[in-house]
Every structure is written in structure tokens, then in C-alpha cells.
Curated annotation (Swiss-Prot):
Top-level taxon of the source organism: Bacteria
Membrane topology (UniProt): Multi-pass membrane protein
Keywords for the protein's UniProt record, in alphabetical order: Cell membrane, Germination, Membrane, Transmembrane, Transmembrane helix
Keyword Transmembrane: yes
Protein name, as recorded: Spore germination protein A1
One GO term of the biological process aspect: spore germination
Residue stretches spanning the membrane: 242-262, 284-304, 321-341, 351-371, 373-393, 406-426
Job description of the protein: Forms a complex at the inner spore membrane which acts as a receptor for L-alanine, thus is involved in the stimulation of germination in response to alanine. Can stimulate germination in the absence of GerD and GerK gene products (fructose and glucose receptors, respectively), but the response is improved in their presence.
Length: 482
């Protein structure tokens, strides 16, 4: 876009702007010639702009037109909080965001009137992060509303909001929020740098932004947390993390993040610590079940039958007597079926989707057993895995475990128990090397240390919660950093 500065001649200035906006039917171009010789020209998109606001502003500007002078126009522009811009690029950005640009002959600037028409849905309950107890408000697609929701919940005098335009043409409104003195200065600097370096023009949602700014694009694990809950963002800010908001997205990004943080749920702190600790422990157990239960079944049936108790080995052998497929194919058949049912349930309307998932799973499982395509033991195994995968509170993390489960199954089918151990070592090594905005993603020493168990696998009473950062994998903040 043009970086040329405006001049005092209105036609020259319009020649810099109008060609860039092309011939749009919803682009309103109005010209007013006053009796005293002043010429006003204003541009806006009708569908994005409140035309009543534009009309009132123009009436205020041209009042008493017979005696109106440029000095009086400037004073009235100040009264209307019109923002002067000196280049065509900034003017076009403002028009595309729903504002009205006013050009006046004799002035070497365009003046931007804030007349955008906000179209957003009302506040609703979270759909992907439901809790039994806690706030029932979720973010919406309007960035200003989301900023207000966060500030309303985060009553801190040092809460800082920085707005920024991102994308190849710097047209997408975004913002970062952090609490000065709690967030690490290096993390804030890195967030700003990565946002400014984005060269993609089409950013429709924070999910696109997440992929553009994460540390390792080839890792199966999410390195940025996303949430639709204002209370979750507020808690993260108090713990020294940085929030990233994008206009038109109801999900806020939080950095840095760790494996422990991704396994936490907001209602962990709204319930009694004993029950919350038990549920959190079950979540970590569900990781093992999701990743390795199918693999263990394949290993024991294919290679290590001797590790099973005799009665169980006989039962499994009897169940598989008429199954014509090897264990790996049998397991893949059921796992793929479950994934298809899960995907179908997500895409269909809620009542119908739930019915498809429940009825489809029961009917297909029963039919597969009766047709001797799979064993009944495997149906139980796959059902337990499906339930375990739903306990992961972060949807993106759950997807990662589901993908890795298939790799684990192939490892078990090829190398047996050694394949599972090798796969575990590879995942462990990857996690310990992974970072999130320079902070460790998984630190075994800190994660399993008794000193830090107050907010990792278990949650002790809130009075024992550290004042600075409530997760052992989360970076500590020096008091001297801002």
C-alpha cells in the first residue's frame, strides 16, 4: 500500500486512496461543496459503518457553512475525537475497519471518525470448556468485548494492554495483555516480535495465529494454550503469563505453556482440593491409557502371551479364536471406527451428534463382535481408551494423544514391548527438549518433585499455593523484570 504522505489538495489525496479500494458497491463516496468554497469528501463502507454516526458528525462539521473557516473545522474535528492520519495506507486500514475517512481541501491529512458498527453475538456459556462449578461466561468474536471481560475479572493496577495490527498488510487487529512485574520481560518481547513478523494475509482465527508463532511447527504437542474462558485468562495473567487476542476469534492464546498447565481445568480451583486432586490424578492416568492401552493389547496378544495370567490368556485366546485378522489390524479397525464416530458426532447438530456417537458405537461394536471381525476384549479396550481421551481438558492436547496412539500401536506391532519402550523414550526426549516461548515445556525434575506437587499432579489447599507462579513448569518472574 501507498506510504506517500497526503498534500493539501483533496484530489491528489483521493487519487492515492480510491484506486486501492476499487469499485465496491458498498463503498459510500460523498462530496460536499460549501458556499464558502470548502470541499469535504468522505468515504466509508455502508455495511460496516453506523451511518447515523456519520451523518451526525458531518452535520457538526459543516454547521454555519457560510462563515466556516479551516480553523473552526479543526476545532470541531478535535471535539469529535477525529484521528488525523498522514498516509494512504493508514487511511485505507481505518476504512476497512468500519471507520469513516474525511478529506478536506486545504488540509494535508485525512481525519478518521470512529463510526464502526459492532456486530457481535451475546455472551454465552463456554462450549469446549464446560465446568460444573465456576463462571459461565465465554469470549465472543469481538476483541473489544473480550478485552473488557478480561479487565473486568483482573482487578490489577498494572494490567497492561497493547494493541497491534498484524498480518502481511497489518490489517488484522490483535492485542496482548500482561501484568507488569509478573510477566517475564523476555517473553513479552518475544511475543511482540513474533506477532510483528507474521507475513500471512488471511488470519481468520487465533488457531491460524497459533501455528504461525509457536516454537516448533513439527511437534505434535500444542505449545500455546487456547481458551474461551475469561477466568482462565485472568488466572494465567496473575501467574505471569501473556494473553494474545485476535479480532473475530472467541479463543484467547496464553503463553508460555507447559504439559502440566495443559492438564489443568478451571474447576480444579472451584472444588475441594481433595476431590480436585483425585480428578487431576485421573487425568494423568488417562494419558497413559490413551497412548498405550491398545499397544499393550497388541503386544501381549502378538508377542508376550506368557506375561498374562493363565485364566486371562485363555479368555483372550477363546475370544480371538474365530477372528481372522492379526491384532494390529483388528485394533486399527476399531480405533478408526471410533474416530469416525467421534468426528461425525462433532459435525452433526448436538442432539443428533450425541445419539450417533452412542448408538453408533454400541451397534457397530456388537455387530463387529458377532461377525467375528474383532474380539469382545478389544471392544472393551477401545471403549476405555475413548473415555480416557475425553478427560483431557485441552482439546488440542487430546488430539495430539490420539495421533500418537496410532504410532504407538505400529511400534508395538513391529517390536512388541521393546517398541512401546522405544516409543516412550522418543516422546520423553521430545518433551524435555520442547520449549514454549523460551520456557521449558516439560521438566521432569520440577514436575515430579515433592516440593512442587502443590500444583502439578495433585492440588493442595489454596493457602499453600505459591504467590508468583502456580505451576512448577512455568517460568519464575524476577521482581526486577517488567
Amino acid at each position: 500500500m501507498e506510504q506517500t504522505e497526503f498534500k493539501e489538495y483533496i484530489h491528489d489525496n483521493l487519487a492515492l486512496v480510491l484506486p486501492k479500494l476499487k469499485e465496491n458497491d458498498d463503498l459510500v463516496k460523498n462530496k460536499k461543496m460549501l458556499a464558502n468554497g470548502l470541499v469535504f469528501y468522505y468515504l466509508y463502507f455502508s455495511e460496516m459503518t453506523d451511518e447515523n454516526k456519520v451523518s451526525e458528525a458531518i452535520k457538526t462539521l459543516i454547521k454555519d457553512e457560510e462563515t466556516l473557516t479551516l480553523d473552526q473545522v479543526k476545532k470541531r474535528l478535535d471535539q469529535l475525537d477525529a484521528r488525523p492520519v498522514e498516509t494512504a495506507k493508514k487511511t485505507i486500514e481505518s476504512i476497512l475497519n468500519g471507520n469513516c475517512a474525511v478529506f478536506i481541501n486545504g488540509l494535508d491529512k485525512a481525519y478518521i471518525l470512529t463510526t464502526g458498527k459492532k456486530k457481535t453475538r451475546s455472551l454465552t456459556e463456554p462450549t469446549t470448556e464446560k465446568v460444573v462449578r465456576g463462571p459461565k461466561v465465554a469470549f465472543v468474536e469481538d476483541i473489544d468485548t473480550n478485552l473488557a471481560l478480561i479487565r473486568q475479572r483482573t482487578s490489577h493496577p498494572k494490567l497492561i494492554t497493547k494493541k497491534i495490527m498484524i498480518g502481511e498488510n497489518k490489517l488484522k487487529p490483535a492485542a496482548i495483555m500482561y501484568i507488569e512485574g509478573k510477566a517475564k520481560k523476555s517473553v513479552i518481547k518475544e511475543v511482540k516480535a513474533r506477532l510483528k513478523n507474521i507475513q500471512l494475509e488471511d488470519i481468520q482465527d487465533s488457531g491460524t495465529l497459533e501455528e504461525l508463532i509457536e516454537d516448533n511447527k513439527y511437534s505434535p504437542f500444542p505449545q500455546i494454550q487456547n481458551t474461551e474462558r475469561p477466568d482462565k485468562v485472568s488466572s494465567a495473567l496473575f501467574n505471569g503469563r501473556v494473553a494474545i487476542l485476535v479480532d473475530s476469534s472467541p479463543f484467547v492464546l496464553l503463553v508460555p505453556v507447559s504439559l502440566g498447565i495443559l492438564m489443568q481445568s478451571p474447576d480444579d480451583y472451584y472444588e475441594r482440593w481433595i476431590s480436585a486432586s483425585l480428578i487431576r490424578s485421573l487425568r494423568f492416568a488417562s494419558i497413559f491409557i490413551t497412548l498405550f492401552l491398545s499397544s499393550i493389547y497388541i503386544t501381549l496378544v502378538s508377542f508376550h502371551q506368557g506375561l498374562l495370567p493363565t485364566a486371562l490368556a485363555v479368555t483372550i485366546s477363546a475370544n480371538r479364536e474365530n477372528v481372522p485378522f492379526p491384532p494390529i489390524f483388528e485394533a486399527l479397525l476399531m480405533e478408526v471406527t471410533i474416530e469416525l464416530l467421534r468426528e461425525a458426532g462433532l459435525r452433526l447438530p448436538n442432539p443428533l451428534g450425541q445419539t450417533i456417537g452412542l448408538v453408533g458405537g454400541v451397534v457397530i461394536g456388537q455387530a463387529a463382535v458377532e461377525a467375528n471381525l474383532v474380539s469382545s476384549i478389544l471392544v472393551i479396550v477401545v471403549s476405555v481408551i475413548a473415555l480416557a481421551s475425553f478427560t483431557v481438558p485441552q482439546y488440542g492436547m487430546g488430539l495430539s494423544f490420539r495421533v500418537l496412539r496410532f504410532i504407538s500401536m505400529f511400534s508395538a506391532a513391529i517390536l512388541g514391548l521393546y517398541g512401546i519402550i522405544l516409543f516412550m523414550l522418543v516422546v520423553y526426549t521430545h518433551l524435555t527438549r520442547q520449549t514454549s516461548f523460551g520456557s521449558p515445556y516439560f521438566s521432569p525434575n520440577g514436575f515430579f518433585s515433592l516440593k512442587n506437587t502443590d500444583d502439578s499432579i495433585i492440588r493442595l489447599p489454596i493457602k499453600n499455593k505459591p504467590k508468583e507462579v502456580n505451576n512448577p513448569n512455568e517460568p519464575k518472574t524476577d521482581s526486577t523484570e517488567t
